[in-house]
Each structure stands twice: as structure tokens, then as C-alpha cells.
Amino acid sequence: KAVATLYSECCQIVVRKDSGITGIDDLINKTVSVGASESGTEKNAEQILKMSGITDELINKVNMDYTEAAGKLKDGEIDAFFCTAGTRTEVIGQLSKECDIRLISLDDKCIDKMLSAYSLCEKYTIPAGTYNGQDSDVTTIGVKAVLIAKQSLSDDVIKNVTKTIYEHADDFKYATSLDITFDINTADGVDIPFHSGAAAYYTERGINVLTE
């Protein structure tokens, strides 16, 4: 069951700056890491490619985690990699210091299709300067990370967890390098049922969430 929306992870598409790849269509006939097998990154990559009209036959898809993909991109063994994570992703930040990279923006048509198809998606801007050498904003898709718990956990425990997340949000910011925010009002956009303990917390604050 859902407990809380945590922060927006963004779909980042990374290429070498000298690759000549400037848009999603340029990935055609290229070798692209779509993330580890069965990962959230792979799912998002497949959604973005589908909405962009890029079928499996048009690219050479490989499965790698972020760290491996960054190394392969640096060495020129792949042309691009997808990474769904919070901005200021450490792996991408380190890569940007070791070689010149570019993050690819998604076009409005792809973004509009993603927003229509998936309720947890949002338009997301990666500000200029987020990574070394990134001199302009990058427009992409954000996906809300959702905390999940077993329904067997007690209502009191889950209600307290939910309360802690939102009422001590600043403490979490100091504990990570990620650029994160917690917005309680995004909970009503989650399309999976919430744990009854979490739902009780939201109800007290006038927020309706899905419970079944």
C-alpha cells in the first residue's frame, strides 16, 4: 500500500557532448542503455521511446545500471544512457567532471503524451548548472517516487511514519545530496491504494487519497 509521495525523480538521458546527439530522434541506430533489467529506469525509458515513436528495431538497447553505463559512455562503448533519479545524481555529476556530456531535452509532443498516459508524471526542468558544463535548462519528465508499505503494518506505525516525512521534511534534505522537496498535496494524484494509517493522516489534513 502507498504511504507517501517522496520527491520527483527525473528521467535523464545522458550523451557525450561530442556525439552529435541533440534530441531523442538522434538515438535511432545508436546503442542505448535503458537501465538495469526490470528497473524503474527501464520502464521509463520504454515509455519515453514509445511515446517518441522509437521502436525496439530502431535502436540497440542494452541493460546496465547507472555506474556501468556511465563508464561505458565515457569509454565510447555506448552512445547514451537513461537514468531515472533525483537531480544532482552523483554518478552523472562525477561523469560530467571526467568527460564533456550533454543531457537531452524531450520535445513537447512526447511530454504531453506522457502526461496524458501516466498520472504520476509531470513536466520537469533540470536547471542549467546542475551538472558540470550544463549551460542551459533541460526539459524532461519527472516521476513521483512513492513510499510503499505492507498493509499488515499497524495504522499507528504508518500514520507516524507519514507524519514524520512531512513534518520533518527539512531533516531529510540535509541527509542527502539530492535536490528534493516533499509536497503533501501530491498524494491525491497517486493511483494505487494508500495504507489505512497513511490515509488517516491525510484525512486529518483535508486531503482525499485512494484507499481501495
Report the location of each language-model feature:
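C-terminal lobe and pocket-closing loops
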Residues: 102-160
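Second-shell loop/turn segments in exported
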Residues: 30-36, 144-152, 184-192
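Short, glycine-/small- and polar/acidic-enriched structural segments
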Residues: 1-28, 33-36
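Soluble non-cytosolic domains of exported or imported proteins
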Residues: 18, 36-43, 64-67, 82, ...
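Ligand-binding cleft/hinge of the Venus flytrap
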Residues: 42-62, 74-77, 94-96
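Short Pro/Gly-enriched coil loops immediately N-terminal to beta-strands
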Residues: 3-10, 96-97, 105-107, 139-142
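Envelope-exposed proteins and targeting segments
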Residues: 9-11, 28-30, 62, 99, ...
